[in-house]
Curated annotation (Swiss-Prot):
EC number, as in UniProt: 7.4.2.8
Source species of the chain: Shewanella sp. (strain W3-18-1)
Name of this chain's protein: Protein translocase subunit SecA
Transport in keyword set: yes
Primary enzyme class: translocase
SMART domains: SecA_DEAD, SecA_PP_bind
Length: 909
């Protein structure tokens, strides 16, 4: 009841928002007749006029109605397409830092041209962001004629283009590209050697297509640029041979139950646990193979690396399944996106997991990586001055959009009423019964000539259905991560009479399914088609279209409920576009993942008690509610994980912004002479304080130690003891000043020898190189801190507060080390001429080019759990590192938490 009340309130607020925007729509419509009278040249001149008005002090809101009317009129002339009133509403929502929920087929791509044009008038650049390269290229090329007609330039930013092409793309008025590429360019710009190497302008306005996919589904997966670390492929191969010797047991050991297996899997938490028996077995196997000393423990401090490899191998074998979580193609393990079902070439799991999967599959093992730079989408997109997004399904996640990004969601009405028929779920006892019912439904649809889109949650499931259809001689097309090159073509023709298309999750998103097939694609396939050919293709399509509508339109058939209601709604949304006929139904079984993990055994027991015969389905509101509640639980858990990830990443983000801002200032500055002077006083002063404590008596001074340190670290040979012996009036303060002055004099002598301009350039190069090296080490230290921070909860401390405190200490340490190392290098290195600085810069670039950078959109593996384990969910459970006697799985944990060892530090990550 309370939920319904909230929905009602949200709906009324939505109506009020639309009512306010409707007034502007009336203004735009009133301008239409006048704009139709303008010549092409007069219409094009509007762009220059708007820019002049903005320069004179008018705002975007002041010119919005006229700008939208201009785009609408230009679209009529260039595309022969007129923006509907609902598209004008959508455009206004997108201009006002909000998310527009627009149903599939309502013309989101054309809607985006309105705010893109308006915001491009500022000259600061507009980024239109899509989920893949194909959509970015398609939308850019489709809309290019419209924008160029209005005098704007269009750029495309996708993977694989050169630096100059990227610069040109970013300097365009409107840049289309993928979320990953924009994020990686931001990181690359902050690793650049000079201002000329940067490609991005300041982040002004981002318009995100499929915003739910990018800001929610991918929010847990940070973008990481990493370089190869040491080679440990042989160790992965050896450890991999141990795992097949281990036996799984159904449930975890407890006081009441001790199994015969070596490990157990917690499917709900996606974790795997060694049993006490399994732990001993692994240690014995390692000893047999000479990888562990006799009597040594896997959990001793010296064996941390070995434990890491064993954990990774066990997870690879038990939690990651081929053709579900990844595929093997051309000798490489390629991750499959759990949300879209698409493959993600070039991306790798972190923490050694990818190498463990490669060892499992017997393919070439690539080196582990060291993080060079990383950022989450949450923190990247929050840097934009203006942010907006559009999708067909945002309403279910409206709270998260508002809470995390400050974006309100506005549901834009459809241009025509929705007539799709959404039928109740059918639940079967077994998966086999479910698949038989699905095949029967498909056959019935084909007899009527009704096209069917079958949505699956994994590649494995899509291939199983494909095999069943081959057996039943049902012609079909398979669209999954293995064949996404043909994705758009298959989806576009999925609406033909009697067509059967199997699609993994939301593969093909962004391409409309037109009833009767896509006649435009047929025309595009011909070389220079004649008007007669075009007319015939369109006439044939009209016949097919009418036949499909008569058969009931596109039928959506879901083979399993997804964890998120939103993704189920996306599948349903493929039918019923622009008022078309259509229908949808989900087929479920008690063996489905969601039902097995989250629906209780009572549901299955009740179904059996009802005396259901084989092949019989249950269709009841109570069951539907139970499924929806299970989905809500998972959604809430995933939201908590994303929220906690953000809270932790915010700490790192504050530091990242400070470092990147400092780095950019260094690169842009003509000279950093003043900076060097300031830090020189700090560094030399801090070293003196260690040997001559402030306001201390001379007996406490360590003068020989100070002389040695100044000579070793700063090439400063000073007779300090001799000064003190000869000069009775030389006190602590004057001595300090003399030492600092001595360093300054030595540095000035160096400057006179090589020339001021050469030294200034050298200072900048040293500062940047030192900062980059320390930042890389700092990222590794922060990762290490985050992985173990949950343990503070056992000491009655707040892990989040402890993380903030310790990360600040690490950052302070970074800044102090930076100052010290820069002054030390500048003191020691002898620069002879300009060529030395140039050689240093060239060597640095050469070394960087050798680094095989890996661009990951790697899942945040350490971030698991949620729900009741609020703080523990921040990091994977790290096994206790222990020396001495072995702790039993059911013994009290040595950390003092009061919990059993297996439930505390005995958990595997």
């Amino acid at each position: 009841m309370f939920g319904k009340l909230l929905t009602k309130v949200f709906g009324s607020r939505n109506d009020r928002t639309l009512k306010g925007l409707q007034k502007v729509v009336i203004k735009i419509n009133a301008l239409e007749a006048d704009y139709e009278k303008l010549t092409d040249e007069e219409l094009k001149a509007k762009t220059a006029e708007f820019r002049e008005r903005l320069a004179a002090g008018e705002t975007l809101d002041d010119i919005m109605a006229e700008a939208f009317a201009t785009v609408r009129e230009a679209s009529k002339r260039v595309f022969e397409m007129r923006h509907f009133d609902v598209q004008l509403l959508g455009g206004m929502v997108l201009d006002s830092n909000r998310i527009a929920e627009m149903r599939t087929g309502e013309g989101k791509t054309l809607t985006a041209t309105l705010p893109a044009y308006l915001n491009a008038l500022t000259g600061k650049g507009v980024h239109v962001i899509t989920v893949n390269d194909y959509l970015a290229r398609r939308d850019a090329e489709n809309n290019r004629p419209l924008f160029e007609f209005l005098g704007l330039t269009v750029g495309i930013n996708v993977a694989g283009i050169g630096q100059q092409e990227k610069k040109a793309a970013y300097n365009a008025d409107i840049t289309y590209g993928t979320n990953n590429e924009f994020g990686f360019d931001y990181l690359r710009d902050n690793m650049a050697f000079s201002p000329q190497d940067r490609v991005q302008r300041p982040l002004h306005y981002a318009l995100i297509d499929e915003v739910d996919s990018i800001l929610i589904d991918e929010a847990r997966t940070p973008l990481i640029i990493s370089g190869a670390a040491e080679d440990s492929s042989e160790l992965y191969t050896k450890i991999n041979t141990l795992i097949p010797n281990l036996i799984r047991q159904d449930k975890e050991d407890s006081e009441e139950y001790v199994g015969e297996g070596d490990y157990s899997i917690d499917e709900k938490a996606k974790q795997v646990h060694f049993t006490e028996r399994g732990q001993e077995k692994v240690e014995n196997l390692l000893i047999e193979r000479g990888m562990l000393a006799e009597g040594d423990s896997l959990y001793s401090a010296a064996n941390i690396s070995l434990l890491h490899h064993v954990n990774a191998a066990l997870r690879a074998h038990t939690l990651f399944e081929r053709d579900v979580d990844y595929i093997v193609q051309d000798g490489e393990v390629i991750i499959v996106d759990e949300h879209t079902g698409r493959t993600m070439p070039g991306r790798r799991w972190s923490e050694g997991l990818h190498q463990a999967v490669e060892a499992k599959e017997g393919v070439h093992i690539q080196n582990e990586n060291q993080t060079l730079a990383s950022i989450t989408f949450q923190n990247y997109f929050r840097q934009y001055e203006k942010l907006a997004g559009m999708t067909g399904t945002a309403d279910t996640e409206a709270f998260e959009f508002q809470h995390i990004y400050g974006l309100d969601t506005v549901v834009v009405p459809t241009n025509r009423p929705m007539v799709r028929k959404d039928m109740a779920d059918l639940v079967y006892l077994t998966a086999n019964e479910k698949y038989q019912a699905i095949i029967k439904d498909i056959k019935d649809c084909r007899e009527r000539g009704q096209p069917v889109l079958v949505g699956t949650v994994s590649i494995e499931q899509s291939e199983l259905l494909a095999r069943l259809m081959v057996q039943e001689k049902i012609p079909h097309q398979v669209l999954n991560a293995k064949f996404h090159e043909k994705e758009a073509e298959i989806v576009a023709q999925a609406g033909r009479t009697g067509a059967v298309t199997i699609a993994t999750n939301m593969a093909g998103r962004g391409t409309d399914i037109v009833l009767g097939g896509n006649w435009n694609m047929e025309i595009d396939a011909l070389d220079n088609p004649t008007p007669e050919q075009k007319a015939k293709i369109k006439a044939d399509w009209q016949v097919r279209h009418d036949a499909v509508v008569a058969a009931g339109g596109l039928h959506i058939l879901g083979t399993e409920r997804h964890e998120s209601r939103r993704i189920d709604n996306q599948l349903r949304g493929r039918a019923g576009r622009q008022g078309d006929a259509g229908s949808s139904r989900f087929y479920l079984s008690m063996e489905d993942s969601l039902m097995r993990i989250f629906a209780s055994d009572r549901v299955s027991g009740m179904m059996k008690k009802l005396g259901m015969e084989e092949g019989e389905a249950i269709e009841h509101p109570w069951v539907s509610r139970a499924i929806e509640n299970a989905q809500r639980k998972v959604e809430a858990r995933n939201f908590d994980i994303r929220k906690q990830l953000l809270e932790f990443d915010d700490v790192a983000n504050d530091q990242r912004q400070v470092v990147y801002a400092q780095r950019n200032e260094l690169m842009d500055a003509e000279s950093i002479e003043d900076t060097i002077k300031n830090i020189q006083d700090d560094v030399i002063g801090a070293v003196i304080d260690q040997y001559i404590p402030p306001q201390s008596v001379e007996e406490l001074w360590d003068v020989p130690g100070l002389e040695q340190r100044l000579n070793q670290e700063f090439m400063l040979k000073l007779p300090i003891q001799e000064w003190l012996d000869k000069e009775d009036d030389l006190h602590e303060e004057s001595l300090r000043e003399r030492i600092i002055t001595s360093w300054s004099d030595a540095y000035k002598a160096k400057e006179e020898m090589v020339g001021a301009s050469v030294l200034r350039q050298f200072e900048k190069a040293v500062m940047l190189q030192t900062l980059d090296g320390l930042w890389k080490e700092h990222l590794a230290a922060m990762d290490h801190l985050r992985q173990g921070i949950h343990l503070r909860g056992y000491a009655q401390k707040n892990p989040k507060q402890e993380y903030k405190r310790e990360s600040f200490e690490l950052f302070q340490q970074l800044l102090n080390t930076l100052k010290h190392d820069v002054i030390s290098v500048l003191s020691k290195v002898q620069v002879q001429a300009q060529s030395d600085v140039e050689e240093m810069e060239a060597r640095r670039r050469e070394e960087d080019a050798k680094i095989q950078r890996d661009y990951q959109h790697a899942a945040a593996e350490a971030l698991v759990g949620g729900g009741d384990e609020d703080d523990e969910s921040i990091a994977a459970h790290t096994p206790m590192i222990r020396d001495g006697d072995k702790v039993g799985r059911n013994d009290p944990c040595p950390c003092g938490s009061g919990r059993k060892y297996k439930q505390c530090h005995g958990k595997l990550s």
